[in-house]
């Protein structure tokens, strides 16, 4: 009993020497962990948005696949390379829709210790493979068109070409209606401009733009079919259309390739201006300087940011963190943000590592 009293007294004596723990800072850290993901998803319905996007893409890709096969058959029967080129453009649309569907599926897979960013960039690799395959198909069609112009030994069935191209215009209109977004959505805490952009799924919007481009090409093929149907001696219009539409297909894929290279090289994504982000952070009260600002993207529609913010003395770090995060999220809707708060020192003005990148 005496030994218990002795150890109890010893414990009280040693405990009095332990420095006090700063509980408010611990509490703030817990709160910041609580709201950093909760507020990011509050007021939005990502799962229902993805389901709507999937339904639209399923319908459009099914229509696209069926008619692409029909155009290949019709182009073969009509001996028309222009229709074959239009089918190649449909292949571009179909491939982009498959990539979008794949990205919507793979983005729901959880990250692992090995793939700690998740599987987001599988979409980028698929897009690169799609572009390369389309270039091969287009190159073959251009080669055949050159051969036709040189030899002149070919016949085109104007009636079959006319029917097929007319159906192509109708099918592209149907696909456009299936992918068209009415613009109804929900917005909480964002500007009108930001909410109007966010309520449109980027995958569906990209597919819709592809279909509009293919519709214009199909109208061109239809005009060529009318010319050949009434004036069969003008059959050289077909290979000429093949050249023109091949340029259109390559132009479409070049924009995709540019986005792919930008993501793989971890460049600043489209829609996010480096200087604007920097000035927005410097406008937060208490922020004296910033450095190591990096902006890149996991995929085309998922920008990521990391930055070190230097704050003045006696400034609430958690308050600065909250304001900076809310402003960035409200204006740019970053997928992931990592913001490190540190104390400002005068030597940051002359430190080369603390200076921003060149233009």
From Swiss-Prot:
List the ranges whose topology is Cytoplasmic. 1-56, 108-123, 181-207, 258-291
One Pfam entry name: Cation_efflux
Q: Where is the signal peptide?
A: none
Per the record, what are the reactions this protein catalyses?
Zn(2+)(in) + 2 H(+)(out) = Zn(2+)(out) + 2 H(+)(in)
Q: Where is this motif: Lysosomal targeting motif?
A: 281-282
A Gene Ontology term for the protein's cellular component: zymogen granule membrane
- The transmembrane segments are 57-77, 87-107, 124-144, 160-180, 208-228, 237-257, 292-312
Provide the residue positions that the database annotates as binding Zn(2+) 1: 89, 93, 210, 214
- Keyword Metal-binding in the entry? The reply is yes
Give an example GO biological process: zinc ion transport
- Give the matching Gene3D superfamilies: Cation efflux protein transmembrane domain
Q: Which domain of life is it from?
A: Eukaryota
Q: Which factors induce or repress this protein, as stated in its UniProt record?
A: Up-regulated by dexamethasone (at protein level).
**Compartment(s) where it occurs, according to its Swiss-Prot or TrEMBL record:** Cytoplasmic vesicle, Secretory vesicle membrane; Zymogen granule membrane; Endosome membrane; Lysosome membrane
Q: What UniProt keywords are attached to this protein's entry?
A: Antiport, Cytoplasmic vesicle, Endosome, Ion transport, Lysosome, Membrane, Metal-binding, Mitochondrion, Mitochondrion inner membrane, Phosphoprotein, Repeat, Transmembrane, Transmembrane helix, Transport, Zinc, Zinc transport
Question: How does the record say this protein sits in the membrane?
Answer: Multi-pass membrane protein
Q: In which tissues is it expressed?
A: Detected in intestine, kidney, seminal vesicles and testis.
Q: Which residues carry this modification: Phosphoserine?
A: 283
**Amino acids binding Zn(2+) 2:** 36, 291, 308, 342
UniProt keyword annotation of Cell membrane present: no
Q: Which NCBIfam families is this protein grouped with? A: CDF
Please state what the protein is called: Proton-coupled zinc antiporter SLC30A2
């Amino acid at each position: 009993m005496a030994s218990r009293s002795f150890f109890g007294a010893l414990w009280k004596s040693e405990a009095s020497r332990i420095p006090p723990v700063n509980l408010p800072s611990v509490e703030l850290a817990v709160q910041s962990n609580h709201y950093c993901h909760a507020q990011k998803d509050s007021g939005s319905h990502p799962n229902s948005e993805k389901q709507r996007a999937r339904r639209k893409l399923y319908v459009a890709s099914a229509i696209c696949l069926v008619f692409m096969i029909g155009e290949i058959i019709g182009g073969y029967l009509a001996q028309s390379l222009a229709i074959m080129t239009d089918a190649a453009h449909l292949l571009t649309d179909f491939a982009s829709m498959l990539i979008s569907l794949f990205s919507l599926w793979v983005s729901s897979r959880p990250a692992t210790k090995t793939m700690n960013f998740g599987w987001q960039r599988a979409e980028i690799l698929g897009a690169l493979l799609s572009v390369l395959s389309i270039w091969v198909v287009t190159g073959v069609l251009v080669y055949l068109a050159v051969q036709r112009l040189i030899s002149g030994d070919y016949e085109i069935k104007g009636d079959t070409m006319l029917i097929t191209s007319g159906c192509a215009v109708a099918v592209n209109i149907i696909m456009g209606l299936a992918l068209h977004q009415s613009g109804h959505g929900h917005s909480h805490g964002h500007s009108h401009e930001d909410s109007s952009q966010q309520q449109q799924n980027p995958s569906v919007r990209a597919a819709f733009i592809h279909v509009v481009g293919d519709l214009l090409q199909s109208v061109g093929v239809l005009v060529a079919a009318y010319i050949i149907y009434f004036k069969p001696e003008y059959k050289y219009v077909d290979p000429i259309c093949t050249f023109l539409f091949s340029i259109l297909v390559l132009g479409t894929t070049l924009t995709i390739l540019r986005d792919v290279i930008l993501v793989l090289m971890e460049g600043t994504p489209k829609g996010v201006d480096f200087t604007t982000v920097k000035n927005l952070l410097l406008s937060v009260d208490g922020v004296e300087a910033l450095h190591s600002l990096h902006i890149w993207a996991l995929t085309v529609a998922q920008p990521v940011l990391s930055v070190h913010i230097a704050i003045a003395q006696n400034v609430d770090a958690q308050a600065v963190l909250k304001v900076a995060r809310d402003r960035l999220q409200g204006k740019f809707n970053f997928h992931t943000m990592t913001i490190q708060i540190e104390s400002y020192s005068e030597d940051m003005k002359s430190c080369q590592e603390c200076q921003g990148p060149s233009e």
